Curated annotation (Swiss-Prot):
Forms a cyclic heterotetrameric complex composed of two molecules of XerC and two molecules of XerD. This is Tyrosine recombinase XerC. Keywords: Cell cycle, Cell division, Chromosome partition, Cytoplasm, DNA integration, DNA recombination, DNA-binding. Site-specific tyrosine recombinase, which acts by catalyzing the cutting and rejoining of the recombining DNA molecules. The XerC-XerD complex is essential to convert dimers of the bacterial chromosome into monomers to permit their segregation at cell division. It also contributes to the segregational stability of plasmids. The lineage of its organism: Bacteria, Bacillati, Bacillota, Bacilli, Bacillales.
Amino acid sequence: MANVKNFLTLFIEYLQIEKNYSKYTIVGYISSIEDFERFLHVQGIKGFEDVTYPDVRIFLTEAHEKGLTRRTISKKISALRSFYKFLLREKLVKENPFLLVSLPKQDKRIPKFLYEKELEELFEVSDLSTPLGQRNQALLEFLYATGMRVSELCSLKESDLDLFLDTVLVHGKGRKQRYIPFGSFAREALDLYLQNGRRILLLKAKEPCPFIFLNQRGGPLTPRGVRYILGELVKKTSGTLHIHPHMLRHTFATHLLNEGADLRSVQELLGHSNLSSTQVYTHVSKDMLRKTYMSHHPRAHKGK
């Protein structure tokens, strides 16, 4: 297919420089485009500029028949729609065949979150006498205290911290920045790590690393590394938890709203562009639901 590499190179530069997307978002976009490129090759379509709306429908039908989830298909549509919007802007194609495609309706699922007792146990398993244990504790406390995305956590530098006001400057999606405060537990864990564990880890580095959270070799910690660390910490707990890093973000939002925080403030803290993205967290935990019921229903208690 002609000019594919040129198209992709230009698009990647656009995502990096103009949109300021993370490398993980860009990898997802490129994967969707390459998947579409393979489809075009099988269909005998010569180039991106030759794609029509019926071709897009066939592609999406095949994706559905392969068993891809609505969420995955939506991501592919979003990536390809953005790609064609870019190509159209650069006058490399004459139309965007994905404009007429609507995103599949998503199943409304309540985000999984941790209860406070589960969190407390997780906070007790790190060995604070070791550099890695200090890092793990700071990582856990910071994810829960700020609700930031793992990619945002991994990109934090010391210059982003304001230890006088206990706030952190987070560099979010699309060049958007926001300040998030953090509490005394996160501050204590962070101080221990910065003053001890991180300094020891830096001694193992081949070159100075500006990022706050480091791997065991003194290099920058990756989101994949965070997932591994969480998995190892969970193994040390007594329960059968299955935790992914984003669950701590879900937990952050759920706990704030359950304790009375207003939706707009939580939206700001999470860095959501749309309030609808935050509203998914307005579910009520089963414990709170039961307490409310038992406190207010006239026939909740016999003999009242």
